[in-house]
């Protein structure tokens, strides 16, 4: 089966949905979407190259998880037995690792285990938020609704991360160009200039001399530089996996100039969106806080949530518990307080998440617009300095010839 990216309107909610569907052809994809209650607006064949690494590495992507969740929700909502629904979804997935996991889940379900317990055995595919929502769906008898909420939350999270990665793409390309320009000048042009002046027995300007020494260093010890980078990168990666390294990395994200606002809003949106989904499906407040502390994926924010959870356990309101936490933006406890007064905490957390998601979109666009000219100026300075270092001795040589 082929994978198709689609954009469709949900007939029930009238909302636009973007996701992935697996089918033999575009027409088959359209029919499948229509059967699931969607009005297809756009269907495009997915480039196989984008899934090449995922298929052969055994990695389960967000798209794999979203497709699985949406299809399972549709089948369960249509009244199919759980095991049969799982088998149908298993047949449609192209990810080998996902097929293996679903087969194990089918065996567990047929053996009498609950679906949530079966999912919990595979944390690499289904995190604690996923398991909690499925468990809530089992308790309330609204499994299909819980799965649809899960898919929607995962799509929002994936879209947000995609925008952040997209914003960093242009700066990465420009930095790569800068490195290539420097490498070309150091290893191609500079040695020729050095040879010319060595033959003429002429002195070199300081900038040119520094460039030549740099080029000679990298030419003779390039292997040492590469080895040092590999070893340094390995030890840095290992350090960042330690408890101290994780804390340093997460603290850095929350305080790094220019980007700290984006990171904080991203974590607030993640906390609020996850909390909204959990509470709306009947997950108790304390369980919601415990699960979101894992879901935010930042140890500093996680500790803030757990401290607030302890205060809530002692009888304090959630809004008051979060109001004194340094890294929680002020709007979060304010909106939660309104929710506490109206009895609609989940709705207010959803609105809070939407506000931060919208602000994050604007900041990402603004950052991209701001970074472009800064990088171009930096590139011009680097290239200009290197060109000047090469031309200065040439002008000096021409001047000496004219004087004579």
What are these model-predicted stretches?
Residues 224-244, 278-295:
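Alpha-helical membrane-embedding segments
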Residues 195-206, 217, 243-261:
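Membrane interface segments of multi-pass transport proteins and intramembrane proteases
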Residues 159-238, 358-404:
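Bilayer-spanning, highly hydrophobic alpha-helical transmembrane segments
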Residues 99, 187, 208, 243-246, ...:
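Non-catalytic, surface-exposed connector residues within folded enzymatic/regulatory domains
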Residues 1-173, 250, 254-373:
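Catalytic metal-binding core of the metallo-beta-lactamase
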